[in-house]
Amino acid sequence: MGGISIWQLLIVALIVILLFGTKKLRSLGGDLGGAVKGFKNAMTPEDENKSLDDKEKDQTAATSQQAAEKQPETESKDKQA
């Protein structure tokens, strides 16, 4: 009786979407995500930030290398078909 039901939440969400629009909400979500990421980076010590950046660079390099390796395979399959 005293709680908020799913229908009430849906009605509030619908009103918010109608008032602000999806583009405004999307940009607001992106800004909020950036703020949270910045806060997390500010809370970690400087040494950990450097190691996290190195890990991200390694993951990015590995991902791009895997994508480059997969690309010739798909091209050869396309040529065979």
Swiss-Prot record:
Question: Where does the UniProt annotation locate this protein?
Answer: Cell inner membrane
Q: What are the protein's UniProt keywords?
A: Cell inner membrane, Cell membrane, Membrane, Protein transport, Translocation, Transmembrane, Transmembrane helix, Transport
Stretch list, region Disordered = 34-81
Topology term for the membrane: Single-pass membrane protein
Please tell me one Gene Ontology term that the record gives under cellular component.
TAT protein transport complex
Example GO molecular function: protein transmembrane transporter activity
Q: Which InterPro entries match?
A: TatA/B/E, TatA/E
Q: Name one Pfam family in it.
A: TatA_B_E
Give the Basic and acidic residues compositional bias ranges.
47-59, 70-81
Just give the chief location class.
membrane
Q: Which residues cross the membrane?
A: 1-21
User: Main role?
Assistant: Part of the twin-arginine translocation (Tat) system that transports large folded proteins containing a characteristic twin-arginine motif in their signal peptide across membranes. TatA could form the protein-conducting channel of the Tat system.
Official protein name in the record: Sec-independent protein translocase protein TatA
Q: Organism source for this protein? A: Shewanella frigidimarina (strain NCIMB 400)
